[in-house]
């Protein structure tokens, strides 16, 4: 880059969907808010990781009221985020904060293990759009290094695409 030519920016987003601890309930479960685009009824019954104040990741399970405890009206109603919690095994707010080290504002991420099947030549994982976009920028920048171009190339791995670029 010499600063005298038009600039072409290669851009990909590096963030991914997740949650944030909004409150710690008296029974030790966590209320969460969404970071990015989620469909509420897809959230319960999944393993997640909650980062604590020590930087450790605590396993948890997203939960909602079981259908056998719901009224017929509740079963027909859309699931609201206020009715979704994360259970990390704490039995009180104090235990969640002191023993588990969880604070309001801590990130919560889905536990999705990357796998590759040689039989089908398929990968299973999360955030491929983010990771592949950033990898494509790096590979392109590497391939273009040292080439004479009539433009300057800039690579950017941006954030906040998942939350509406606020």
Predicted regions and their residues:
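N-terminal hydrophobic/helix-forming segments and targeting peptides
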Residues: 1-166
């Amino acid at each position: 880059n010499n600063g005298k030519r038009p600039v072409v920016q290669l851009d990909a987003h590096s963030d991914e969907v997740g949650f944030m601890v909004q409150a710690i309930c008296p029974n030790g479960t966590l209320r969460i808010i969404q970071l990015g685009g989620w469909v509420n009824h897809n959230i319960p019954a999944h393993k997640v990781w909650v980062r604590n104040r020590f930087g450790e990741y605590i396993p948890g399970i997203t939960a909602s009221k079981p259908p056998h405890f719901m009224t017929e009206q509740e079963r027909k109603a859309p699931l609201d985020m206020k009715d979704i919690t994360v259970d990390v095994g704490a039995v009180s707010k104090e235990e969640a904060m002191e023993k588990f080290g969880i604070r309001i504002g801590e990130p919560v991420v889905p536990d999705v293990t990357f796998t590759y099947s040689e039989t089908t030549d398929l990968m299973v994982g999360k955030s491929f759009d983010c990771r592949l976009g950033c990898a494509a920028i790096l590979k392109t920048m590497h391939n273009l290094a040292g080439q004479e171009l009539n433009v300057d190339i800039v690579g950017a791995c941006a954030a906040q695409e998942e939350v509406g670029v606020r």
